[in-house]
Amino acid sequence: MPKLNCFASLLILFGLFPKFSADGSERPNILWITSEDNNVNWVGCYGNPHAQTPHIDKLASEGFQYMNCFANAPVCAPSRSGWITGVHPVSLGTLPMRSRYDIPHQEIKYYPDYLKKVGYYCANVRKTDYNIGGRSDDDCWDSTKLEWKKLKQGMPFFQVINVASSHESRAFGEVDNTTHSPEDIQLAKYHPDIPTIRKNYAHYHDAVKRMDAEVGKFLKQLHQHGLSENTIVVYNSDHGGVLPRSKRHLFNSGTHCPLIIRIPEKFRAWWPAESPGSKIDRLVSFIDMPKTWLSLAGAEVPEVMQGKIFLGKGREAERPYHVSYRERMD
């Protein structure tokens, strides 16, 4: 076994990883669940009475529902390059889809690098797609598996779970035998009200329902393993979508994303409102997320990060605007 792994194992065994930050406050676990391609219009708690998302809706009732969260890019890889670095893709040169240009990795590290410095176990199951060359996408993660046993070993964890059931690819295929009724949809004004469109809406509602069930499964597992009371849960999608005029397009349909954050009672000082179940109007840009996660964890927040901390004791002034952008993409 490598020496570093032996040393880490001893630290875990004797409980010596820093569960408390420098100011004496307890470090939270963070579970970040992401889905793909669904904008707010596919989620019940955001106002669609036909959406079947009971687990996400329940999470919103237990947490804080952000009403104005926007992706910086309306497609996955550029969007995720901003997530992993905290730097705008237009600054990095990662905006063109599938380009994977190198960046100066010595100056621009990935946010899990900073989490691991303060004792976090960092895992991603499993979507990276960072569109960055010169470094393996998996290099910053301790694991690409969901291993509840390791998450219970005493060190704080940052666990990413990506649910792909709502990805654009799930919107294709047979649309004549859906469980969701084509009559029970909220049709966008820019789509014609014809049977084919209604069937495609119903088909994607089925995909979102499956995604919601997976979110519910992971939240149940978190509870069953006795980790809920120490874990901040974040749910959001990676950009908008998925029917025509959404994904890849710089409209709200391509960028306006659900964001729900459940914060345990022990961290109530970080609540953005008086009580869970509140709707939060603050404007949040995806570029704000990595900087905020580092702040919540009590980790170093590098100056190169361009976002605003929107939650916790390090919260910064609300951003006056958000910017989205796109370039070449498939």
Locations of the language-model features?
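Formylglycine-dependent sulfatase
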Residues: 2-7, 20-330
